[in-house]
Amino acid sequence: LEMMVDIDRMLILLEAAQASGLPVWVGFSMRPDDAGKMCLFSGEPLKDALAALEGKGVPLVNVMHTEVRDVNACLDVVDEHWNGLVGVYAHTGDMVDGDWVFDGIITPQDYAVAARGWLDRGINVVGGCCGIWPEHIGEVSKVI
């Protein structure tokens, strides 16, 4: 499941997806609140979303569609509140009048450095979301 932005919707979608009998990964889209705590786009704390998954049979959670600069803060919360596998696929870019603008995005080399840091923290899966192009993934492949 991608872009889980609120807990209630996540739980409903998780139940439906698990009815397939296939393993279901859950990807959270996050940003810091005014106090700097990592939250889903709904404003619900990431730690609460992780707690809601307890006992639900989810093997992996992803920090996804989240700014590169916010990933480590998200991983701090995940490290404290999650015992399963972890993935990261961050985004880079800006929303301008409802449209993505990819001027001044992170360079492929800098994304690879960030990805290596996430891998060093123990994540299991790394990729890219909006604004992360094949060139970025090519650089990441060199540091895996």
Range-by-range predicted roles:
Residues L1-I144:
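Domain-level signal for soluble alpha/beta catalytic cores
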